[in-house]
């Protein structure tokens, strides 16, 4: 029987609520999410604008404390660490590519979305097919050939 590989990053019952004075009340950005990432695994966070992608990544990377739930990185509960302990753990384990620089400028939107699949050894044809399907699902399939410099921030 094979031994199960442990997660390098794990989030359990993750919630994040932004306070708001708007008529609708507070904004729930994350609602009970569970995430597990194993060493060497490539993961893409995909969703429409305003769906909580950036909030999730900030919570997973220790840049923001979740309203509830916990995040473990390299076996340590990050949600309980503060100050220097948290800084040292982040320096050893996690890096960020912020939204402004996360697309490869010489590749089309389609090829950028297909990249994580190619790293998982998915054939180029299948990776492009799946990437186009995802872009269509998000309502931006018509922008598949666009270079990052021609896309808006929400695309």
Where in the sequence are the language-model features?
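ABC family nucleotide-binding domain
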Residues: 5-155
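A short, compositionally biased domain-edge/stem linker segment
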Residues: 1-2
């Amino acid at each position: 029987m094979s031994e199960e590989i442990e997660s390098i990053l794990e989030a359990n019952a993750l919630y994040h609520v932004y306070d708001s004075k708007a008529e609708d009340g507070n904004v729930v950005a994350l609602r009970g999410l569970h995430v597990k990432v194993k060493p060497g695994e490539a993961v893409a966070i995909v969703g429409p604008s305003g769906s909580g992608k950036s909030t999730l990544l900030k919570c997973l990377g220790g840049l923001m404390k979740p309203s509830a739930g916990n995040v473990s990185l390299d076996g340590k509960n990050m949600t309980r660490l503060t100050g220097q302990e948290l800084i040292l753990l982040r320096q050893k384990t996690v890096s960020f590519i912020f939204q402004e620089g996360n697309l490869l400028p010489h590749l089309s939107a389609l090829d950028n979305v297909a990249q994580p699949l190619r790293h998982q050894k998915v054939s180029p044809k299948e990776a492009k097919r799946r990437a186009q399907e995802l872009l269509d699902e998000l309502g931006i399939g018509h922008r598949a050939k666009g270079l990052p410099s021609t896309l808006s921030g929400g695309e």
